Amino acid sequence: MKVFVVLLCLSLAAVYALEERLDKDADIMLDSPADMERAKDGDVEGPAGCKKYDVECDSGECCQKQYLWYKWRPLDCRCLKSGFFSSKCVCRDV
């Protein structure tokens, strides 16, 4: 009987720890509810005519931030190899 009580207590402690971890991860992944109401997917912050996520760019042309997948993401121009001698630069999250 004592073993059963100990196992029950350990399993309850594990469930509680998992719930705390999931709550913490949810807070990290999502911005505050006020930000979610104001921003919509695709909204950007930056100078007029700045490039959005996954658009070809040169250095300094990307928007500062774009709201994607429920979070503000800072953007930067990243160059990816598209061939042996060539590369393609696109705006990606930092």
UniProtKB/Swiss-Prot annotation:
User: Among its keywords, does the record have Disulfide bond?
Assistant: yes
Q: Location of site Interacts with insect Nav channel?
A: 58, 70, 78, 81, 85-86, 93
The set of disulfide-linked cysteines is 50-63, 57-77, 62-91, 79-89
State what changing residue 78 to A does. Answer: Almost complete loss of activation of B.germanica sodium channel
Q: What is the effect of changing residue 84 to A?
A: Severe decrease of activation of B.germanica sodium channel
Spell out the molecular function terms from Gene Ontology.
Answer: sodium channel regulator activity; toxin activity
Q: What does this protein do?
A: Insecticidal toxin. This toxin promotes opening of insect Nav channels. The toxin binds to the S1-S2 and S3-S4 loops in the domain II voltage-sensor of insect Nav channels (i.e., receptor site 4). The American cockroach P.americana is largely resistant to the effects of this toxin due to an unusual sequence within the domain II S1-S2 loop. In vivo, paralyzes lepidopteran and dipteran larvae. Paralyzed insects ultimately die from secondary effects of starvation and dehydration.
Family, as annotated:
Belongs to the neurotoxin 26 (DTX) family.
Q: What is this protein called?
A: Beta-diguetoxin-Dc1a
